[in-house]
A protein has these predicted regions:
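C-terminal soluble interaction/assembly domains
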Residues: 340-346, 351-364, 398-407, 412-414, ...
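C-terminal long alpha-helix characteristic of the crotonase
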Residues: 245-246, 277-320, 433, 489-495, ...
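Short, positively charged and aromatic/hydrophobic N-terminal segments
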Residues: 6-16
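Cleft-lining beta-strand/loop regions that shape enzyme active-site pockets
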Residues: 66-186, 315-442
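Helix-enriched interaction subdomains in cytosolic or periplasmic regions
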Residues: 24-43, 271-301
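N-terminal type II signal-anchor transmembrane helix
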Residues: 21-61, 65
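Intrinsic disorder and flexible/low-complexity segments
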Residues: 318-321, 325-361, 480, 551-608
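Charged, glycine-interspersed solvent-exposed loop segments at helix/strand-loop junctions
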Residues: 190-288, 440-520, 524-526, 530-536, ...
Length: 608
């Protein structure tokens, strides 16, 4: 009996041993299978991605009877790029580059297969200087004799400003036109910060340097209100004149429409007011498109998008004019560790390296520095100014200002050979400031954290957020700010060939629209990027030339890597979600990453 039990136990144990061997064998096979499957997925996935990108980047020929569709939707970036993550997920973000739009319009003008442009209105987030550049390109397109037709279910004020350039403007029978004038609503967070126990200590130069008001005041100062009023009046004046010229409507009438909120009128009133040429549904517009572009009713209309035009190549002849894009807040070094990415920053150290490389590149005969920035680090601005000075010794440098080139954005290129700005560009703001957060109340009273000190010198703990600056420290800082302001002012004096008194009279942090900046010699000419390129070629004495954009756009692999990390994708999602509140949000978010001394635009206006 005992022997039988032992034999049974042995048999059971032996069976378990066999089962465990089988188990590990099956697990191993499964793991190997998963690895092989993963490799296959990666290989075919990579092949699919390469196929997608290659097809998107392949050179295209425009079909006969094509129409360029200018879809005014999403947010406008200074430079466009392929949304690799969106291509993979089928959820491409609504962002298009100003460079792509301008290039597409220019190519459409010169392409005999493109009959005209169809403007489709949506929700389009763009500043007026960029809109002005697009509008001017559309006006230039019309010089070819080709037509433009515009249609919208609704028109925002900014989109109507663009659409009014069209030969025919149509609206949905149940649509509306938002026409109300321009207002500015600066945001103030002093009381919010006070609730959490934070206050800022500020040292600044310039009565108009109101960038700090957002944190230390609850309303606009008189100088800030004065320059803001002048700024929005300048923009509105341009909008009125442009619409008046295109639609043949008296400026006084347009103001009357805004004051009476014609936005909420019966759509038929828009026709009577000459704001639109007719009320049509989407399917009816197609017939109008064919009629206007000289096509038979049965002829197909081939639609070509702005991004499609990237792959329509033009001949590159002559010498190279480099167009270097610098847009976003100015920082000393790359911002790392952010879930939102940092693609919308001007990194001073990187720009200096790039400009140095352009100076040494014998193929580059002239450089256009395209600036769209409200400023940032005063230190980085000075370093870039110096690099422009070195670049100038070897080849002409022309600055093209976008929506804004103010404070540090003006500083970095004020010594260029020539400066071109749009009439509605925000520029100037010659001044600097320092802001130091005092978090002592948050830390000690709100959170109950106590601090003690051990130090070697009297001011060893200078700049600590755990205590406010004392009067002596503020005095030292003020003298440093004064020196920085004097240097900024001198850079403008030397770059613009003005006297100290002339610059001081227009400095103090004062901002100007491009038209007014021309009068006081802060800029040399009004116009867009195209005009700046032509000027650069002229200064370099080039009869034939082509342009090359710098820095080079990220490769699809770099974009995919960035997309997989989520940073830039989240940044674009945030931009699309917050819209006009994106810039002030990012300013608040990055305050602790910025250098203490700032040369920054005096406000984020939240223009409506």
């Amino acid at each position: 009996m005992t022997l039988l039990i032992k034999l049974s136990i042995f048999a059971f144990s032996n069976q378990n041993i066999i089962s465990m061997k089988d188990f590990f064998k099956y697990v191993g096979a499964t793991v190997v299978g998963l690895i092989v499957f993963g490799l296959i997925v990666v290989i075919f996935g990579t092949m699919s991605i390469v196929g997608l990108i290659s097809s998107a980047q392949a050179t295209q020929n425009v079909s006969k009877n094509s129409v360029l569709v200018l879809n005014l939707s999403g947010s406008l970036a200074e430079q466009g790029s392929d949304d690799v993550w969106g291509m993979l997920t089928g959820n491409e973000l609504g962002s298009v580059g100003l460079d792509d739009i301008l290039s597409a319009i220019k190519k459409a003008k010169n392409n005999d297969r493109i009959k005209g442009i169809y403007i489709e209105s949506g929700i389009f987030l763009a500043n007026y200087a960029s809109r002005q550049e697009i509008r001017n390109a559309l006006l230039d397109f019309k010089k070819s004799g080709k037509k433009i037709i515009a249609y919208g279910d609704n028109y925002t004020q900014g989109n109507y400003y663009l659409a009014s350039v069209a030969d025919k403007v149509f609206l949905n029978p149940q649509g509306m036109i938002d026409w109300h004038g321009i207002g500015a609503q600066p945001m103030f967070v002093k009381d919010l910060l006070k609730k959490v126990g934070i206050q800022y200590q500020v040292v600044k130069v310039g009565k108009y340097k109101s960038a700090t008001e957002m944190y230390i005041a609850d309303k606009m100062s008189d100088p800030s209100r004065e320059q803001t009023q002048a700024y929005i009046d300048g923009i509105w004046s341009d909008v009125l004149k442009a619409v008046s010229d295109s639609r043949k409507i008296n400026v006084d009438k347009l103001n009357q429409y805004a004051d009476s909120l014609i936005t909420f009128s019966n759509p038929k009133d828009y026709v009577d007011a000459k704001l639109v040429d007719g009320l049509l549904y989407t399917n009816q517009v197609k017939d109008e498109v064919k009629k206007m572009f000289g096509l038979d009713k049965d002829d197909p209309v081939n639609q070509v998008g702005v991004t499609d035009m990237r792959s329509v190549k033009e001949e590159s002849e002559g010498k190279q004019v480099a167009v270097y894009y610098a847009y976003g807040s100015i920082v000393d070094n790359p911002v790392t560790g952010s879930m939102f990415g940092a693609e919308h920053m001007i990194v001073g150290s990187e720009v200096c390296k790039d400009l140095e490389a352009l100076a040494e590149d014998d193929d580059v005969k002239a450089v256009v520095l395209r600036i769209n920035s409200g400023g940032g680090s005063a230190y980085a601005s000075e370093q870039m100014w110096n690099q422009v000075e070195q670049l100038k010794k070897k080849k002409p440098v022309v600055v093209s200002m976008g929506d804004m080139a103010a404070s540090g954005g003006y500083y970095m290129g004020c010594n260029a050979n020539w400066i071109v700005a749009q009439p509605t560009t925000l520029t100037g703001s010659i001044g600097i400031f320092a802001m130091i957060p005092d978090m002592s109340q948050l830390l000690t009273q709100k959170l109950g954290i106590k601090f003690d000190e051990v130090k070697t010198n009297k001011n060893s703990t200078f700049g600590s957020s755990a205590r406010p600056l004392n009067a002596e420290e503020i005095g030292y800082l003020a003298r440093y700010i004064d020196r920085g302001y004097a240097l900024f002012r001198q850079r403008v004096v030397d770059g613009r060939k003005l006297s100290v008194n002339q610059v001081e009279a227009i400095a103090q942090g004062h901002v100007f629209v491009g038209r007014d900046a021309l009068k006081i010699k802060l800029v040399d000419e009004l116009g867009g990027l195209e005009k700046a390129v032509e000027k650069a070629a002229k200064l370099a004495k080039l009869d034939e030339f082509y342009t090359q954009d710098y820095p080079a756009k990220a490769s699809w692999m770099d974009q995919l890597t960035g997309a997989m990390s989520g940073g830039n994708y989240l940044d674009e999602q945030l931009r699309a979600t917050l819209g006009e509140y994106y810039e002030p949000f990012m300013l608040l978010k990055t305050m602790n990453q910025q250098s203490m001394i700032q040369a920054r635009i005096p406000f984020y206006l939240n223009i409506r």
